[in-house]
Design a protein with these regions (language model features):
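Rossmann-fold cofactor-recognition segment
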Residues: 31-49
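N-terminal Rossmann NAD(P)H-binding glycine-rich loop of SDR-like oxidoreductase domains
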Residues: 2-23
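Conserved Rossmann-fold NAD(P)-dependent oxidoreductase catalytic core, especially the SDR/UDP-sugar
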Residues: 88-115
């Protein structure tokens, strides 16, 4: 089974990646490099061809664990880009594949951030 984990360096994504790596072919999707990460196969969204790399990988399962909630005082546009537009781009890119998309959501108290 080929699995794409979106948000592979995050709390949930890193744990799911560790769990699935020994049983399946896993590629992570991340916004920026993390020198402490132990994940072997990563697609960075800063690369010009990141969408094409996802399509070439042909995942059977995509697990979205992306969560930008403003802990670094990101503006609302960054939250919308990460939490809404990024998953939509991935969904549109894999529409021709027979893949399952699993979306994981989180919530925070309203006084925490714009999230």
């Amino acid at each position: 089974m080929k699995i794409l984990i979106m948000g592979a360096f995050g709390f949930l994504g890193s744990r799911l990646t560790s769990y699935f790596e020994s049983r399946h072919t896993v590629i992570g999707l991340a916004r920026k490099r993390n020198n402490e990460a132990t994940i072997n196969n990563i697609i960075y969204t800063t690369e010009n061809n990141w969408i094409e790399k996802i399509v070439e990988f042909e995942p059977n399962i995509i697990i979205n664990t992306i969560a930008c909630y403003g802990r670094h005082n990101e503006p609302a546009t960054a939250l919308i880009e990460s939490n809404i537009l990024m998953p939509i781009r991935v969904l549109e890119s894999i529409s021709s594949l027979d893949a399952v998309f699993i979306n994981c959501g989180t919530s925070l108290p309203p006084n925490t951030s714009l999230y």
